[in-house]
């Protein structure tokens, strides 16, 4: 089986795009474009960083509810964007747990916390904990664990298969990560405005009933993943039992809000 829908990226107004679709067992259902090319991930870095944090949790290096970040916040708050930290500044704008304030600063403080707990620089810890075991040789998380990752469609398909059928983590840990943290919390979904609630798991955004949204109209409410400002996304739809990755070299904007949902709907209609 080779999906024809992935070729729809040819219609996107971008210089370069690559995409792929994968099942939980690692079966790649279709790819299109330069899937071995390395693209800046922007915020698609966050799911990789979050997965490394969950490995650190299972190894006993950190606890989800231990203090981390600003006063009163925990590792869980940082992963779920409820620490109260501002978007790109290391200052608080709300008490922990009160609002879903999407925060790059929160993931940077999370990386610092894990580096201190493990005595390993976070990028190296992530390489040892996640990238190397999954064979993601073309992926790096140097710089900010919120936004500076670089990867390929091929590598991210390996990661998406892992999240669907975990080998590095207990499946119960992954299930908890895809469960809404601090239910009912409202906030802004970058690029899509205010959402009430703005549901999030541990490092992964959860679609639920959000509208508008970057996934498709036919995406199940349980769909989770992330998109990045560099024109990238990764989603996993547990009901469809499939995951999709798309990477481009054009920044997110109205073109993406228009092109991505029908692309996702076409993929889901074909699997």
Residue positions per predicted region:
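Active-site-proximal alpha-helical segments within enzyme catalytic domains
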Residues: 47-51, 106-113, 147-169, 176, ...
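Active-site Gly/Thr loop motif
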Residues: 147, 153, 179-239
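Flexible glycine/proline-enriched surface loops and loop-helix/loop-strand junctions
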Residues: 33-36, 93-96, 107, 141-145
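Glycosyltransferase-associated regions of secretory-pathway enzymes
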Residues: 21-23, 64-68, 139, 201-206, ...
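Active-site helix/loop module of the DD-peptidase/beta-lactamase fold
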Residues: 40-44, 48, 56-92, 102, ...
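A short, well-structured edge-of-sheet supersecondary motif
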Residues: 2-41, 80, 205, 233-237, ...
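Structured C-terminal helix/loop/strand segments within mature extracytoplasmic catalytic/sensor domains
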Residues: 223-271
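Short clusters of small/polar residues that mark proteolytic maturation junctions
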Residues: 31-33, 67, 228, 248
């Amino acid at each position: 089986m080779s999906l024809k829908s992935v070729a729809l990226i040819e219609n996107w107004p971008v210089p370069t795009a690559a995409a792929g679709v994968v099942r939980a067992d690692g079966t790649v259902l279709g790819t299109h474009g330069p899937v071995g090319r390395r693209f800046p991930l922007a915020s698609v870095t966050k799911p990789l960083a979050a997965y490394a944090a969950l490995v650190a949790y299972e190894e006993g290096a950190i606890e989800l509810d231990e203090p981390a970040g600003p006063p009163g916040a925990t590792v869980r708050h940082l992963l779920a964007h409820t620490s109260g930290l501002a978007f790109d500044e290391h200052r608080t704008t709300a008490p922990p747990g009160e609002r879903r304030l999407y925060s790059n600063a929160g993931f940077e403080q999370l990386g610092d916390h894990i580096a201190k707990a493990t005595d390993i620089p976070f990028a190296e810890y992530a390489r040892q904990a996640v990238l190397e075991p999954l064979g993601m040789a073309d992926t790096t998380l140097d710089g900010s664990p919120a936004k500076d990752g670089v990867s390929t469609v091929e590598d991210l398909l390996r990661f998406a298969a892992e999240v669907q059928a975990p080998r590095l983590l207990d499946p119960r840990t992954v299930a908890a990560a895809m469960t809404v943290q601090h239910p009912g919390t409202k906030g802004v979904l970058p690029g899509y405005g205010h959402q009430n609630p703005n549901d999030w798991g541990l490092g992964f955004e959860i679609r639920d009933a959000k509208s508008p949204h970057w996934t498709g109209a036919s995406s199940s409410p349980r769909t989770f993943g992330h998109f990045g400002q560099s024109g990238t996304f990764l989603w996993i739809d547990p009901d469809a039992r499939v995951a999709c990755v798309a990477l481009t070299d054009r920044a997110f904007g109205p073109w993406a809000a228009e092109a991505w949902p029908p692309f996702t709907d076409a993929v889901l209609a074909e699997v």
